[in-house]
């Protein structure tokens, strides 16, 4: 029986690496996967999922208005899918998370979602909110703060490396723009 998984973490915990490894494991056994990523994140090129350790895969891109049932069923009819893997799932809409539950419940294809839990102000992303509510399995991927504690929050940095307290929820960037920190340091940077 298929399930909906949400693998979440702060930045730099290996979410994309884990997604690419899972896809590889299926493919190595002769099974087809569909790798998807949000169109808003084009750091590694449009239609690519890439890891900081240097591995990458082509991916089908989705925007917040796309119907994932249509996209996935079309891919399933073309290549019988054994698994769907979604990177940057924090950018999913509520309706799209609901559509992924349909893929799992009605079409019986496992869906593995990978993304951030919260933004740089400690607020849930929409996709993460509904995945936390509706996923069958929640898996936290861990990374560490500069102090050695588990990092479960993210802070945004300006061009000079200073922590930003305000701004748009979504600003695409990597290590130059974000730092994963523990809640204690998040509190010092953002709340205090």
Swiss-Prot record:
MF GO annotations: ATP binding; thymidine kinase activity; zinc ion binding
Disulphide bridges, residue numbers: none
Top-level division of the source organism's lineage: Bacteria
Binding site for Zn(2+): 145, 147, 182, 185
GO cellular component: cytosol
PROSITE patterns in UniProt: TK_CELLULAR_TYPE (PS00603)
Reaction(s) catalysed (UniProt annotation): thymidine + ATP = dTMP + ADP + H(+)
GO BP term, pick one: thymidine metabolic process
EC code: 2.7.1.21
Family matches, as Pfam families: TK
Catalytic residues as annotated in Swiss-Prot or TrEMBL: 88 (proton acceptor)
UniProt keyword terms in alphabetical order: ATP-binding, Cytoplasm, DNA synthesis, Kinase, Metal-binding, Nucleotide-binding, Transferase, Zinc
Positions of ATP binding: 9-16, 87-90
Protein localization: Cytoplasm
HAMAP family: Thymidine_kinase (MF_00124)
Quaternary structure note: Homotetramer.
Protein name: Thymidine kinase
Lineage per the UniProt record: Bacteria, Pseudomonadati, Pseudomonadota, Gammaproteobacteria, Alteromonadales
């Amino acid at each position: 029986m298929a399930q909906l998984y949400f693998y979440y973490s702060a930045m730099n915990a290996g979410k994309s690496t884990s997604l690419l490894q899972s896809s590889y494991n299926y493919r190595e056994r002769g099974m087809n996967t569909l790798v998807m990523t949000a169109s808003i994140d084009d750091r590694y090129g449009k239609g690519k999922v890439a890891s900081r350790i240097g591995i990458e895969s082509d991916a089908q891109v989705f925007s917040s208005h796309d119907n994932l049932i249509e996209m996935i069923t079309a891919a399933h009819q073309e290549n019988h899918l054994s698994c769907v893997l979604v990177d940057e799932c924090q950018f999913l809409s509520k309706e799209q998370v609901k559509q992924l539950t349909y893929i799992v419940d009605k079409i019986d294809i496992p869906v593995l979602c990978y993304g951030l839990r919260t933004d740089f102000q400690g607020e849930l992303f929409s996709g993460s909110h509904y995945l936390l509510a509706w996923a069958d399995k929640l898996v936290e991927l861990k990374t560490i703060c500069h102090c050695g504690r588990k990092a479960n929050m993210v802070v945004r940095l300006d061009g000079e490396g200073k922590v930003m307290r305000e701004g748009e929820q979504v600003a695409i960037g990597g290590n130059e723009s974000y730092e994963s920190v523990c809640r204690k340091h998040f509190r010092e940077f953002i709340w205090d």
